[in-house]
Amino acid sequence: MKKFLYIIFAGLLLSACAEDFLEKQPLDKMSEADIFSNAALATAYANSFYTILEDTFTEANVGSISDESWYNYGGSSTRIVASTFYTPDTFQYFNESDNGGLHNTRITHLNIWRNAYKGIRYINDFLVKMEDSPIADDDKKSLTGEAYFFRAWLYTNLIQRYGGVPIIKDVYGLGDEYNATRATFDECVDFILADLKLAKELLPEYDKAVLGRANKDIAMAVEARLTLIAASELFNDPNDAAPANP
């Protein structure tokens, strides 16, 4: 009799076990659903936007070889400049005798084009995920505003160097056709201004408590810079009677 009681008791224990006992999520990983359903995690994800910004003080930056520059190489930057360690004659990417001098294929180590579009894809993906995010509206607005701001910043830097560039607004998968045509300079400016308009509407005012994060004032500053660039002689023939870009 006791033997049968043990069997019945064991059966009850087994039947009481959770069916998903062996279907546990990895404890060392988070899914996208986890990230975009939590404001703190979504903010941490958006923090990576700041790592996309181009570092203007690295030894690879071509602007670092001018007499007025701050050059980061080894120890003292001023010492490197003062000692003429790098000049237009010694810097290989400006030396015409060194495989053709400076052009796009000679500065691939800067990764300006690749890093910009890598960041743009990252931001586009973030914007898609944030549309269905259940986090609080205030958090959602500010994070979305940051994404629009950084996309505008990246495109602003691109058009300064290349003029019109392809405008990528979607997230492409491995099997998608992703060849894009080059937009005109004016089309790029209009696209960037639209992103900055959204950024200004969504970003919060300046707050010392979050010093260093994008805010409404910074978006306005970039907008002013962009419109000055668009109206400059660099992108407008000074002899042209037509008005400059707005």
Positions of PLM-derived features:
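Acidic, serine/threonine/proline-rich low-complexity intrinsically disordered regions
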Residues: 169-172, 234-246
